[in-house]
């Protein structure tokens, strides 16, 4: 027996609003969409996992498509449903088995490090430690786009190093990964590929173009 046709829960504006969590849209789609529809839009599986991979635009498109195509729960044959579910279950089980492989598949680090000044070689930061750094960031053509090193003596007195928790995504990945290899007092030159910097989008506010390789001189002055 066909299930009752659901009503639209949100307007287009509400769907695109930041106040509406992705998980709510996914739950609605999983509650009301047929399994083949969900499989086609890669929406089957644990809501948390789906939310990690699906962006808001994809969910809005799927939501509108569900009402346009009317492929609601209970609108397709059982054999077709079980086949779709079987396929998705197989795919869902794969990441668990290949998790360690996925890490290996990333290839070499997307940065290179040259030590300019050796550290104490005993105090290394761990994930979640607060690190304190002086730095200068330049583009490949030598343009300085950011620095916290002051040149005038007046400003030098008030200058403070950049402090943040390392290894948890507070900064670009190239920094997170490289700082975990540095010891207290070390100064290094980091050449970071776009994938571990600002990627395809760049950082227009800082005048960093898309796909830019960034060069930083970073000094790790302290670890908490």
Curated annotation (Swiss-Prot):
Per its UniProt record, what Pfam families does this chain match? BTHB (PF18410), FKBP_C (PF00254)
In the Enzyme Commission scheme, what number(s) does this protein have?
5.2.1.8
- Which positions bear N6-acetyllysine? 99, 170
Q: How is its activity regulated?
A: Inhibited preferentially by rapamycin over FK506.
Please report the stretch or stretches of sequence annotated as the PPIase FKBP-type domain.
Answer: 128-224
Q: Which SUPFAM superfamilies match?
A: FKBP-like (SSF54534)
Q: Which domain of life is it from?
A: Eukaryota
Q: Which PROSITE patterns match?
A: FKBP_PPIASE (PS50059)
Its GO CC terms are: nucleus
Q: What is its main location?
A: nucleus
Residues the record lists as Phosphoserine modifications:
36, 152
Reaction(s) catalysed by this chain, per the record, are: [protein]-peptidylproline (omega=180) = [protein]-peptidylproline (omega=0)
Residues with the N-acetylalanine modification = 2
The text of the family note is:
Belongs to the FKBP-type PPIase family.
Quote the protein name from its UniProt record: Peptidyl-prolyl cis-trans isomerase FKBP3
Q: Which organism was this protein described from?
A: Bos taurus (Bovine)
In the record, what lineage is assigned to the organism producing the protein? Eukaryota, Metazoa, Chordata, Craniata, Vertebrata
The encoding gene is: FKBP3
């Amino acid at each position: 027996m066909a299930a009752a046709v659901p009503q639209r829960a949100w307007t287009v504006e509400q769907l695109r609003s930041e106040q509406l969590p992705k998980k709510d849209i996914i739950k609605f789609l999983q509650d009301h969409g047929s399994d083949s529809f969900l499989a086609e839009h890669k929406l089957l599986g644990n809501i948390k996992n789906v939310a990690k991979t699906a962006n808001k635009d994809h969910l809005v498109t799927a939501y509108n498509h569900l009402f346009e195509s009317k492929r609601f729960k209970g609108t397709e044959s059982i054999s077709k449903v079980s086949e779709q579910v079987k396929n998705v279950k197989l795919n869902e089980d794969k990441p668990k088995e290949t998790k360690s492989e996925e890490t290996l598949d990333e290839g070499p680090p997307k940065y290179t490090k040259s030590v300019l000044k050796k550290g104490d070689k005993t105090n290394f930061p761990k994930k979640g430690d607060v690190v304190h750094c002086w730095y200068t960031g330049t583009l490949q053509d030598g343009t300085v786009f950011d620095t916290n090193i002051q040149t005038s003596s007046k400003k030098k007195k008030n200058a403070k190093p950049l402090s943040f928790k390392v290894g948890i995504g507070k900064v670009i990945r190239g920094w997170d990964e490289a700082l975990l290899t540095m010891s207290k007092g070390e100064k290094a030159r980091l050449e970071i590929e776009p994938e571990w910097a600002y990627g395809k989008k760049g950082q227009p506010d800082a005048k960093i173009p898309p796909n830019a390789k960034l060069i930083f001189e970073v000094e790790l002055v302290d670890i908490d």
